[in-house]
Amino acid sequence: MAGYDVVVVGGGHAGLEAAWAAAALGVRVALVTVNPDRIGMMPCNPAVGGPGKSQLVAEVVALGGLMGRAADAAAIHTRVLNRSKGPAVQSLRVQVDRDLYALKAQEILAERPVEVLRGEVAALWVEGGRLLGVRTVDGRTLPAKAVVVAGGTFLSGVVWYGRKSRPAGRQGEPPARFLSQSLKAVGHTLRRFKTGTPPRIRADSVDFGRLEVVPPEVPPGSFTGNPGPHAARLPTWQTRTTARTHRLIRENLHLSPLYAGDIQGIGPRYCPSIEDKVVRFADKESHLLFVEPDGLSTTEVYLQGFSSSLPPELQEEMVRSLPGFERAVIQRYAYAVEYDSLDPTELTRGLQSRLLPGLFSAGQVNGTSGYEEAAAQGLLAGLNAARFALGLPEVHLPRESGYIGVLVDDLVGRGTDEPYRMMTSRVELRLLCRADNADERLTPLAVAWGLRPKEDLERVEAKYRRVAAELRRLQALRVEGVSGLQWLRRPENTYRALAERFPPSEPLSPEEAYQVEVRAKYAGYIERQERLREKMKDLEAFRIPEGMDFPKVPGLSREAAEKLSRHRPKSLAEAARIPGVRDSDLTALAVHLRRGA
Amino acid sequence: MNLKDPICAIATPPGKGAIGVVRLSGEGALEIAARVWRGKDPRRLKGGRFALGEVVDPKTGEAIDQAILLVFRAPRSYTGEDLVEFQTHGSPAVLRRVMEVLVAEGARPAGRGEFTFRAYLNGKMDLAQAEAVLALIEAEGELARRQALRALEGALSRRIEALENRLLNLLAHIQALLDYPEEGVEPLEAERTIREVLAEVEALLAQAKASRLAQKGARLALIGAPNAGKSSLLNALLGYERALVSPIPGTTRDYLEAPLELFGIPLVAVDTAGVRETEDPVERMGVERALGIAEEADLVLYVVDRSQPKPAPPPLPWARTLKVATKSDLPPAWEDPEFLPVSSLTGEGLDRLKEAVREALLGREGGEVLLTERQVEALLRARERLEEALSLPEDLMGLALEEAARALALLTGKEVAEEVVARVFQNFCVGK
C-alpha cells in the first residue's frame, strides 16, 4: 500500500480541521478514527462560539477552515452576546443540531480527497529517530511523512460516574490505550487532565412551561455570512438550582471522586462541576442553568451548568429538584473524564514536536478545552504537517495576529497547568483582532499558504477598499460644523443616520457599514493598539537562534537565564512575555544578539 | 522594553548647576518637543540648529523656564534617532517640571543606560563601548534590584499591592461580565471603584513628590520686605556669611542662592530682593523676579520684621508658604500665631523653623515612603489610564484598566493576564 503524506489521528474538531487544511495543499491525507460515523461529533454542549471562542471561529473561517460552515449549516438558534458592550467583545454563539453538525462536517470533509480509515492507532512508527508513520492495533502500518495526533480525551481516557470508573475516551467509546506510551517513548511529558460533562435529559419528560424561554434572534447571525435554513428555529431555556439541590450535594460530597480524592487529574477552573459551585460559592442560594435542545427534533436536552461526577442515583434526585424537571428522566448521566495530555511547551509554534520532526499535535492532547480551540490548532497543525510533507518550512501565526496566535503563544510559550480555554481578556490587542475583521487580517495569509483561492482575497480587498473610500469621504464631509468622522465619533450618532442624510454614491453592505462605524468611533483606541502592535513586532524582529546558550550571555541575571533556557523563546518578544525576565535582561540579550550578528 | 519609543532623561548631574540639560530621543521626539515648546517649531529646525524660547506645560499654558532647544536629526545624533535637547536653568525644580511635561506628552523616562544602548543599536558605537554598557547594566541592574527590593519593603509595598489588588479585582469583574455575559454576574459599580483607586494613586503620588524632594533636593525662597532680615536668616540657617547683609533696605537687588542641607534634604535657598512698592526700575525688576522665584519654589518663607508695623502681604503661593517673624529678640510691634518667631542674632526659633521646613517638604510621615522614578512613572501612567477609563464603554474600560494594571505590575512583577483569569474564577461563579 502506498504511503500518505499526512496521517491524522482522530476525527474530532481538531482532526477534522487538520485533515481539511492538509488536503487543501493537495497532499495525500488519511484520517484514522475508531468510529468514522462519529467524525465531527460534539461530546459536550451543542453550541459553537461565545466570548473568545467566536473570534477563534471567525479566524478559522478566514483561514479556510470548515467549523464555521458546519455550524452555520446546522444552526437552530443564534445570539450575539455583548452587543452593547463594544466591538472588541461582541460574540456570536450558535446552538446547533448535534447530529446535523456531524453530518455537515462529514459532508464538507468529503469535498476534498481525504481517506477516512477505521482503526485504533496503537503507536507511532519510529525507526532510527525518524517518524515513518503509524501502526494500528490490528497490525496495519500506515506509512506517512507527517502525523497529526488529535486524540482528544481518548489518550488513556478514564470516565468516572461517582466513585466508579472505567477506561473510555467518551461515554460508550473505548479509549486510545497505547498511543500515550508512544508519545512518552518519543520523550514527551504527559500529564493527567480532567474535564466533565452534565447530564442529558429526555425532552418529553421536561415541563418546559415552567422554564424561562430565551428566543432565538431574528434575523439569525452566522459565522460565514450565510445563516442555515433552521438558524432561528428553536428557543433555549433557563432554570435554577434550589435549596434542595444544594442540600443533596452537600450531604453527598463524599461520593464524588474528586472530593474523595480518587481523581488526580487537574480540572479546568472555568468548567466547574455543580459540586464545586455549591462548595466554593456557599453563600449563593441558587445557580443559573441553561437548558439547550440537542437538535431540531429535540429528543434530549443538555443541562448546561450542571456537570457533575456524583453517582447516577443521586443525579436523578438532583435533577428532579430543579423547577421544570420534577418528573425528568435522565437519558445519559453526567460524568468526569481523565486523560493524558502532553506538555505544549515541547512543541514549536507550528505545533510540531520539538523532539520528533514530522510529529504534530492539536486539541485536547495539547492541553486545551473546547471545540473552537481544538479546531484552531487542528488547522495550524494540519497546514504545517502538509508543508512538512512537501518540504516547506513551518508557518506561524504570531501573537499580534489574533486569537489563534495568542492561543498558540500561550500554550507553547508558557504552557498550561489546566485545560486552557480562550478568553477575550487573554488577548492584548482585542480591539484590533475582532471577529468582524478576521477576513481582513487573515485572508492574505490563507491565500499565500494555499488554504483559500486567490479570488477570495480579491473580494476581501475590494470590501476594505470600499470601507477606506467611505472613511475618506466622511473625513471630507462637513456635518454640523465638524467632519463626518468627528460627527460619527459622538456616542449618540450612527453611520446609518449619516448615510441617510449624506448617502454614498454606492450604498455599503451591512458588514462594510459596520466596519466604517467601528473604525470611526474607536479611531483613537485602535490607533493606540496599533502602536502596541508595532512595539510587539519590533521585539519580534529580534530573533533568538535555536540552541542559544543563555547562561553564557553577559549581563543576564541567573534567574532570567534559567527561565530562558527552559522556555527557549524564539524572539525578544517571546522572551519579554516570560515571567521573571526583566527589561535589563532583555537589554543584555539584545546587545548580545546584535554582537553575534 | 521598546526599541524606538520616545525616552527622556536629565543629562546633567544631580544638584544645582548653571544650566541643566534634558534630552528627548526616539520616534515622535520632535512632535513631543513641539507640544511643550513656545518658540520656533522644532519640527522645522534642521539638524544641529537651535532656537530660543520657553518650555511650557501644554495643559495649562504655564511657562516653565526660558530655554535653548537643540535639534539633532536621525541618524546624526548621539542615539542615531531624532533627538531634542532642552537647555534650561539648572534648578532641579525646573528640570523636574520639564521631565514631567515630556512624560505627560508621551515620552518615557529612560532606563539606565538606555540612551547609550540605543546609540549602540543604531550603530553609533563600537564593541568596546558596548562592553562598557553591558558592564553598566550588570552593575546597575544589581543596584536597581537592591533598590527595588528596599523600596518594596514594608508600608509602601503593602499599599501598592493593595492598590493593584483592587484594580485586578475590578478588572476580573469586568472580564467576568464580558466573558460570561449570561451567567448572572452582579453588575459593576465601576465608577465608584475606579474613583477610590484613583484617590489612592493620588495619595501615593503626593507622597512621591515628598520623597523625590528628599532624593533630589528642593528649592526654598525667602521673600519679604526690604530689610526684613531675609539675608540674616539665610546666613543663620547656613551658619556662615553668605548673603551681603547691610542695614540699607534693598541691598539684595537680585537674588542669591546657597546650597543647604536640612535633615538630609538638599535644599537650594534663594534669598530674593525685598518686596515693596518701589519706583526704582532696577529694584522693581528685582521685586518681580522675587515673586517669580516664589512661584517656582517648592517652599516659600515669607519673612516679616516683627519689630516694625506689619506690611500688606504680597501675592504668594500661600499653600506652600511658611510665615516667619524675624528679630524676635527686639520688642514686638505685633503678634500673630501664624508667624513663627525667630531671631537670627540669638538663634531663637531656628530649630523650630528647620523642623517646620522639613515637615512642609516631607510631610508628617517624614518622607519614609521613598518612591523611585520607576514607581512614580508607573503610578502616573496608571493614573492616566484610570482617569480615561471612567468615561469608556465596558470593553474599552477593560483595556484601559488592563494598561493601568500592567503599569503597576512593573513594580510587583505580577502577570496581569494570568491574575485576571485566576480572579475571574476565584471571585465569580461562572463557567458551565
From Swiss-Prot, chain A:
Keyword Transit peptide attached: no
Keyword entries, A-Z: Cytoplasm, FAD, Flavoprotein, NAD, tRNA processing
Record's superkingdom? Bacteria
Gene Ontology cellular-component terms for this entry are: cytosol
Q: Output the GO biological process annotations, alphabetical, semicolon-separated.
A: tRNA methylation; tRNA wobble uridine modification
Task: Extract the coiled-coil ranges from the record.
Answer: none
Give the protein family: Belongs to the MnmG family.
* Alphabetized NCBIfam families for the sequence: mnmG_gidA
Name of the protein described by the UniProt record: tRNA uridine 5-carboxymethylaminomethyl modification enzyme MnmG
Q: Which organism is it from?
A: Thermus thermophilus (strain ATCC 27634 / DSM 579 / HB8)
- Gene designation: mnmG
Curated annotation (Swiss-Prot), chain B:
Pfam families for the chain: MMR_HSR1 (PF01926), MnmE_helical (PF12631), TrmE_N (PF10396)
Which residues of the sequence carry a binding annotation for GTP?
227-232, 246-252, 271-274
Q: What is its main location?
A: cytoplasm
Residues engaged in binding K(+): N227, S246, I248, T251
**Protein name (database record):** tRNA modification GTPase MnmE
User: Which of this chain's residues are annotated to bind Mg(2+)?
Assistant: S231, T252
What binding partners and quaternary form does the record give?
Answer: Homodimer. Heterotetramer of two MnmE and two MnmG subunits.
Note describing how the cofactor binds: Binds 1 potassium ion per subunit.
Major enzyme class: hydrolase
Q: Provide the function of this protein.
A: Exhibits a very high intrinsic GTPase hydrolysis rate. Involved in the addition of a carboxymethylaminomethyl (cmnm) group at the wobble position (U34) of certain tRNAs, forming tRNA-cmnm(5)s(2)U34.
Annotated (6S)-5-formyl-5,6,7,8-tetrahydrofolate binding sites: R23, E85, K124, K432
